[in-house]
Amino acid sequence: MDKKTKLLSKKVARIRGLIQAIATLLTNIHIPNLLKGKIYQGKIKTVCVPGLNCYSCPAATGACPIGAFQAVIGSSRFKFSYYITGFFILLGVTLVRFICGFLCPFGWFQDLLHKIPGKKFSTARLKPLRYLKYIILIVFVILLPLFVTNSIGMGDPFFCKYICPQGVLEGAIPLSLGNTAIRSALGTLFSFKCLILITVVVLSILFYRPFCKWICPLGAIYSLFNKISFLNIKVEGSKCVGCNQCSKACKMDIDVCKTPNHPECIRCGACIKACPKDAIQYQFLGKTCPKKEQQQSTITNR
């Protein structure tokens, strides 16, 4: 990769980080509530946000789609929601895992952790663990809330309650710091969830986005739409020289030339930045997103 490409890569990487920061702020706009130890409960809280963001976070703007999905499945009255299902389909078809790469607060949290200096390890040999998130989706998000119910027919949100580290990071910890009653009620389950959070934090420092790759059920849902979405990655075979720089740059362990729109692709753009021949580009609705150089050429020729 030449000096110019490296500079461009760094510039785009900074822009992506800025987008992630803005998305996280908009998803958690009620920051003063963090000091008060109470949850925002306005009308907009019924609207789902695109990424994994705990409803119980005092600063949260909206609802977590996975939490809302479990609430419906575990309800004694309703087992299906056109709103939640439509939400997943709409975002899945339009943005897919671009949400994971640019808009998810917990994805950004893992990115920041991975920037901590130290030895890093590849997850290429751990690819079978990718399927774990689909098992978690089916078992903890769907089956357990649906069939393991109490005396009045209500099921617990098993993923949120027993697995999700975001709930501890954004919900339990800030709420307990600002509310004495909640702090005194914390018990074994909180300790167990803290252990999960610590494990994810340590793994995120060593590996790139372990939670996204192996555990996240929201990523599992969005991945189902990766090959049919409006937003995809286009590899121009006529320009590709087979240098494999794109796959080397991909931290999601994808063979970009063979499967550019693999279910694991989070549309981060690392492969686009790494390609020395400009053979890889974003496409939206079949139209290639013009690069800066192409736009300048078009203006010059007018």
Q: What would you call each of these model-derived segments?
A:
Residues 1-257, 263-302:
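Non-ligating segments of multi-cofactor redox enzymes
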